[in-house]
A protein has these predicted regions:
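N-terminal carbohydrate-binding accessory modules
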Residues: 1-40, 51, 66-67, 74, ...
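Short, well-ordered coil/turn segments that N-cap beta-strands
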Residues: 6-8, 35-37, 69-75, 137-142, ...
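The substrate-binding groove and active-site-proximal loops of carbohydrate-active enzymes
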Residues: 9-19, 44-59, 106-125, 147-154, ...
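Conserved, mostly hydrophobic/aromatic
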Residues: 12, 31, 39, 68, ...
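Short, acidic/polar
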Residues: 19-33, 124-130, 253-263, 321-329
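Aromatic-lined substrate-binding rim segments of carbohydrate-active enzymes
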Residues: 26-32, 40-102, 235-242, 460
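Polysaccharide-binding and catalytic clefts of secreted carbohydrate-active enzymes
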Residues: 102-270, 274-291
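Carbohydrate-binding surfaces of carbohydrate-active enzymes
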Residues: 196, 200, 245, 254, ...
Length: 669
């Protein structure tokens, strides 16, 4: 298995420019005790490197790079372009972004640039080039980190002009634009490209999450994602103009709504991301997001940031309990990471992140619980050498995640404000997670033939080519699982006429006549063929069978007796249509049928409360075994007699794992 790295990178964000040089040396001593081998530097240093328009000063950065190189660190080199220097804002105020309310921001904050500002792009490109020119040939520079956590939104004049250019390229004519956006509605016909304005609070926005014209707002999302991506590519290409084989990434943010990460991943050498769950985030949700980040390129990823213990920006910033950070890190490795990196290595003394966790706390020593846990994990990862690097996850289930659908579903007005895209995806992922069935998170244009089951929850927008791809998959023996609010609109958010689920109707063998929305306090029930019942709610499709077989039927309301779930034979395969949001037991009853029908297997034969994930190299299968429950769990019999790479001991019959306990077992192929 190929990988860019020679060892598991272990370290994180380091800002020695915030400290005196005597502390630098103390840091090197302490970091060595934690087995830290990498530092991400220069993330927010533009103001120091370029103190005025025509002046650069690399003296301090030279010292930092020399120090880390002498200590044999792998350097992740950031380009510093995520926060603008004051001189630029003072001289060129148009570089600052304009928010959804139409307010142009002043100097301050971060992620504060307009991506369509020619001034910003000129100086960002120049800075990336100069950094590469100076440091790219240093053998310790392992990876380039462009900007940081791309994520603002801008609605300024620069963006308005660029949006019009983007639209001209896409639609060619005003007539085509008017048809795509259905501009006869509310008399919104545009006569000239200059009539088009960004859909913010001053035009067709209805709050930041809703819109009068989803077609416009979805296109603006697409345009803005492309605009930010163009900035990333610009800096990447500036680096590669100096060093063509430079390894370049930027840190993504999981299920962040603003950017189409599948499109971004095609331009990145490796996906990296920042994992900051809250105290009550389900472990299945964390696992799903790791699998999504792995799925962006279908390759191992970098964990660019996590906190050693505490965050600072959530509502309740709980400490990670003893053993929790270690278990969380192994879960990250299990789902495809080749690096474990923290924000931050030394805790800041000021600013809004001064209470964000760090390897070195404000006490300034290694005599802390957090440091001891970091050091323990570092020693373990170091002992693995390169054995796990580049190993791959295997899956027979593909779960579709699509940013166009994310935007379209949540922009639409109705039928329920509680309908959230990521929640729906997670509901299905969680079933497979609890069964220890491997899942790939996949785009809509994936090769479906790799999977026995493809799950497409709330596939609201069926874009060109998707119908044919899904039909071919099912006809050739695959199982498709889809749900309510699927097959409703095309790629411009205009409804498919002829009845829901539109292009999926023949394959599903059902016609949805109406969609009922239930308030949180309202529930229905569905009855299965074996007489059991399950609660359901949120949305209830009123559907008619057109060749499909009912799996469950509603028990209550005027549509009692109508199907609540169905399956339809189509070619050699089957389409399952789930017409309502079942509670967990009911959903499991349906998905169990699909899994049994096609013979999808769990990682191990036993049912267990442990999370068990495998990665496979050319010569070894690695079993990551983790206990995230509150109870002791007995190790399944199929995992006994294997060597634990952490303890170097063989697993035994009846072995118990307490909460946060971890095993990494190896099986030679």
């Amino acid at each position: 298995m190929s990988t860019h790295f020679k060892r598991i990178l272990y370290g994180g964000d380091y800002n020695p420019n915030q400290w005196t040089k005597d502390i630098w040396q103390e840091d090197m001593r302490i970091f060595k005790d934690a087995h830290i081998n990498t530092a991400t530097i220069n993330v927010f240093s533009w103001a120091k490197i370029q103190p005025s328009e025509h002046e650069y000063n690399f003296d301090e950065l030279d010292e930092i790079v020399d120090m880390l190189s002498k200590e044999n660190y792998d350097i992740v080199f950031a380009t510093s372009t995520a926060a603008l220097p004051g001189w630029m804002v003072r001289k060129y105020p148009e570089v600052m972004f304009t928010d959804y309310e139409g307010r142009q921001h002043k100097f301050g904050g971060r992620h504060n640039a307009c991506p369509n500002s020619f001034v910003f792009k000129h100086y960002a490109r120049e800075l990336a080039y100069k950094l590469a020119e100076r440091y790219a040939d240093n053998p310790h520079v392992t990876c380039w980190h462009v900007s940081n956590e791309y994520g603002n939104e801008c609605f300024c004049e620069n963006c308005q002009k660029a949006f019009r250019v983007w639209l001209k390229d896409k639609y060619k004519t005003i007539d085509a634009l008017n048809r795509a956006w259905n501009m006869e509605f509310w008399g919104h016909t545009v006569y000239d490209w200059d009539d088009v304005v960004p859909p913010n609070a001053l035009s067709d926005g209805i709050g930041s999450e809703k819109t009068a014209f989803a077609g416009i707002s979805i296109d603006y999302r697409r345009f803005y994602s492309d605009s930010q991506l163009a900035c990333f590519k610009m800096e990447r290409d500036a680096i590669r103009s100096v060093k063509p084989d430079a390894f370049v990434t930027t840190n993504l943010m999981g299920t962040f709504k603003g950017l189409d990460y599948f499109k971004w991943a095609k331009e990145m050498d490796v996906v990296s991301w920042d994992n900051y769950p809250s105290y009550d985030t389900p472990w299945s949700s964390i696992a799903m997001t790791h699998d999504l980040m792995r799925g962006l390129k279908d390759e191992p990823f970098m964990l660019m940031e996590q906190t050693p213990s505490q965050q600072n920006w959530q509502k309740y910033n709980s400490l990670k309990r003893p053993g929790q950070m270690r278990a969380q890190s192994y879960q990250t490795l299990a789902h495809g990471a080749d690096t474990i990196q923290f924000f931050q290595l030394r805790r800041s003394v000021g600013g809004c992140e001064k209470f964000h966790g760090a390897v070195i706390a404000h006490a300034g020593s290694e005599n802390t619980r957090v440091f001891r846990e970091v050091a323990q994990l570092g020693a373990e990862l170091e002992s693995f050498g390169d054995r796990t690097l580049g190993s791959r996850n295997e899956a027979e289930v593909g779960l579709i995640f699509d940013w166009d659908n994310y935007w379209a579903l949540e922009y639409t007005s109705g039928p329920s404000e509680d309908l959230k895209y990521v929640d729906q995806i997670h509901q299905y992922y969680q079933y497979f997670y609890k069964k220890n069935i491997g899942v790939d998170m996949i785009p809509v244009d994936a090769d479906f033939s790799k999977y026995k089951i493809v799950v497409a929850p709330v596939l609201y927008m069926v874009k060109d080519g998707m119908k044919e791809a899904l039909e071919n998959f099912v006809k050739n023996g695959g199982i498709l699982i889809t749900t309510f609010m699927s097959g409703i609109v095309g790629q411009s958010d205009n409804v498919y006429l002829g009845g829901y689920p539109g292009p999926l109707r023949e394959m599903a063998g059902v016609w949805v006549e109406e969609i009922d929305a239930l308030a949180p306090e309202q529930k229905n029930k569905a009855k299965f063929a074996d007489g059991s019942t399950a609660a359901c709610g949120l949305l209830c499709d009123l559907m008619h069978l057109e060749g499909a077989k009912a799996l469950a039927s509603y028990e209550e309301d005027f549509y009692a007796g109508m199907p609540a779930a169905s399956k339809n034979t189509y070619g050699k395969g089957t389409t399952y249509y789930i017409a309502t949001q079942f509670e967990e037991e009911g959903l499991a009853k349906i998905l169990d049928q699909a899994v049994q029908e096609v013979g999808v297997s769990s990682v191990i034969p036993e049912e267990t409360g442990l999370e068990v994930v495998t990665r496979v190299s050319d010569i070894t299968r690695f079993y990551f075994v983790m206990n995230f429950t509150d109870e002791e769990q007995i190790l399944p019999e199929s995992l006994t007699g294997k060597k634990d790479m952490i303890s170097q001991k063989m697993t035994e019959h009846g072995m118990k794992l307490k909460k946060w306990d971890v095993l990494l077992l190896e099986e030679h192929l």
